[in-house]
Amino acid sequence: MSFSVDELARIAIDLQSDIGHTDRFSRLITTLRQILGCDASALLRYEAHQFVPLAIDGLAQDVLGRRFALEGHPRLEAIARAGDVVRFPADSDLPDPYDGLIPGHESLKVHACVGLPLFAGQTLIGALTLDGMDADRFDSFSDEELRLIAALVAGALNNALLIARLEAQNVLPAQAVNYPLPERQEIIGLSGPMLQLKKEIDIVAASDLNVLISGETGTGKELVAKAVHQGSPRAANPLVYLNCAALPESVAESELFGHVKGAFTGAISNRSGKFEMADNGTLFLDEIGELSLALQAKLLRVLQYGDIQRVGDDRSLRVDVRVLAATNRDLRQEVVEGRFRADLYHRLSVFPLSVPPLRERESDVVLLAGYFCEQCRLRMGLARVILAEAARNRLQQWSWPGNVRELEHAIHRAVVLARATQAGDEVVLEPQHFQFAVAAPMLPTETAAAAPATGNINLREATDSFQREAISRALEANQGNWAATARALELDVANLHRLAKRLGLKGSPPGKSSAG
């Protein structure tokens, strides 16, 4: 044998360590890299025609955030289809998914590559990949030895997946376990705040409580709502979405509750509202803080009694709907200031979820960047999208006032810029491809600096200052045209006028001017 009994014992000990699965697999991958003398190794979980990295060693950190779709990675597809050890020759025409992703060797191609598919019975559950810069790196190891390693790792991975499934079933009502659940919405992040959020999602998802999801714009509140729905007994039923900020007051009640024919001008037929569409499922009300007090009262009645009335109809309809609401406002302060009903707030916030801003989960920036790089690679038909080390450092130094959405847009823009200046189907993202609004990273943004100069500024004042600055800039960029400004900010123009008036940007309700 090319490795000793002691080395096998090290592998077995790593697999049986009394630590969490993530740490156990990381230790295992490090041990395998040392024993086999490879330059990089990775443990991947197989799901939905893609491989998801669980642990890596010797690879760039952003690999943990990448999702390797089989159709875009021929070598991984070959490993998935094989029932045994796969050795790729040094002159293989198939591109290696890790080319350019080994620190210190970004400009070199991986030469030696071995793939070990991992099975539970006849079911593919993952893969172990071993890469080396030397063409003969793994020649001294027989297929039998590699199969032994694969069997040990597959057993540990299968146990971890079974435990995770049992834990998920344990928090669901017994009757829900019998139904096939859709694929869970993945939330990228391994930082402490995100691991805590994922735990809270698992806990509240299994209940039927209404949930208030709070967080800054761009943090991923809709993603959290999807995860709650998909982890609930209602997962097989509809998840209906409604953006309250884009809802004109004149049609808001009809959108929520529906209307009957003739209820108002233009009501030419009966129409179901969002509550009816979500019956037996979940209704996600985004930006709920934008609802008028009158609509808040009607929403409260639905939550209290479970019935609705279509506009123009005297009859009540029973609905069974779980409500998930999201806001970027401090609703407690809104209650104090009389803009949000206290009773509705308490109905919604029995189990609140708070989505942390990206600046509070700094270690997730590179993972998310890797995820978006891989998305761009697939969409644009590129062989590789590589994040240079200097670019990774720059991303980690930025404060991300726009959160995950800003990072996503920054990656997409950088890929387009890099592709325009680099030949071939491989792009390398460098610091110059990322252009941020403020030169000094990790410092208060211009918007924050424009806030009232007082040491006692609260979240409400900071939010108002940010919104006031954003609207002012957009209005200036659109030459004072309110309709164009509303489109740029993705808001309903009537809601924008109301918000601008509240923020002191307008002295009176809008008239019918040429500016819209």
From Swiss-Prot:
Keyword Calcium: no
The organism of origin for this protein: Klebsiella pneumoniae subsp. pneumoniae (strain ATCC 700721 / MGH 78578)
Family annotation (Pfam families): GAF (PF01590), Sigma54_activat (PF00158)
Residues that coordinate or bind ATP: 215-222, 278-287
Cross-referenced SUPFAM superfamilies: GAF domain-like, Homeodomain-like, P-loop containing nucleoside triphosphate hydrolases
Taxon lineage: Bacteria, Pseudomonadati, Pseudomonadota, Gammaproteobacteria, Enterobacterales
GO biological process: phosphorelay signal transduction system
Ranges for domain Sigma-54 factor interaction: 187-416
GO molecular function: ATP binding; ATP hydrolysis activity; DNA binding; DNA-binding transcription factor activity
InterPro entries assigned: AAA+_ATPase, GAF, GAF-like_dom_sf, Homeodomain-like_sf, NorR, P-loop_NTPase, Sigma_54_int, Sigma_54_int_dom_ATP-bd_1
Cystine connections: none
Parts forming coiled coils: none
Protein name: Anaerobic nitric oxide reductase transcription regulator NorR
Gene it is expressed from: norR
SMART domains found in the cross-reference section: AAA, GAF
